[in-house]
Amino acid sequence: MQDERVVLEAGPDGLPVLFERPRELVTASTPAGAQLALARLEQARAAGFWIAGYAAYELGFALEPALADLWQPGAPLLHFGVFDAPRPVDASAEEGSALVTGVTPLWSRARYAESFHAVKEMIAAGDLYQVNLTMPVEVSFEGSPEALWSALRAYQPVGHGGFARLGEEVILSRSPELFFRLGADRRIEVAPMKGTAPRGATPAEDDALRDALGQDEKNRAENVMIVDLMRNDLSRLARPGSVKVPELLKVERYATVHQMISRVVAELDAAPTLPGLLQALFPCGSITGAPKIAAMRAIHTLERWRRGVYCGSLGWAAPDGRAEFNVAIRTLNVTAPGRALMGVGGGIVHDSTCDAEYEEALWKARFVTGLMTA
């Protein structure tokens, strides 16, 4: 297991760390296997080891009994390593050269419109309030996965990126979004990201686009819906009265887009287990919609593709109870030499328009398409 490793940019002290030479790999491809795997990971953590790896979006079907019928056989639901303590790593180190040679949405605009209008009908019928509709995108590249991750990292610095090579899969994540951060004192923070606008060509245009996003009623409503969902998810574990929203509707700049973010914090009622945390919170509401179970059913019906690690989570957990996981957006799964699959999309609400949502989805691929000319 010499090649297996996980690099996470948001390590235990907020700095990049490397997990290498795992003592054990823990994976599962069925709901029953996932429950056993999570129990094994918790056992390893209790024995003084660290765990690091990733969970696929579809793990949510194994964790929520109301969604159990959606599971279909396929790729792993989770893949983690059991490690000794991580070591600091220079995440900016060069890994060779890489070039993106193609970025191809696997849905046509008409295919997207078909699912978009179906979501709008569900919203009009009162079945749900928001659905995070995504579509698959194929990426072709030259160079190693490590070199591609290095190039992506240089092009779009983010706070929650990661690289994982565990078994057969290689995952490259350039996520800017925190799923949850848990301290040894049982304080937990989530930071849902909802609302996107492109960067401007000039400083003045860029400021105008940022300000417009911050004032946009649709995006503000979309973000608040997910904040409410996350507050509800946290309340399943939190001490009564401890769930707070210290930051609401903040707009942050990234290399290719502006993003609207909020922050929710809570104090957990008891020392949580990793299975308990994921049972309450996974997957993150920002990539499902609301209500969560209804939105996930709609996604399963309308998308008809396996998201995999995209919209799942990469992260680590420590023996002392600390843990941090991202929301695996802007994330690629290397499927063959020189080929990878990712997803792009966004939240659909009652006043969304098809053309605007389709274009927003394409903006979110700029962290990759930018390397075609870099």
Where are the model-predicted features located?
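Extended alpha-helical targeting/anchoring segments
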Residues: 1-374
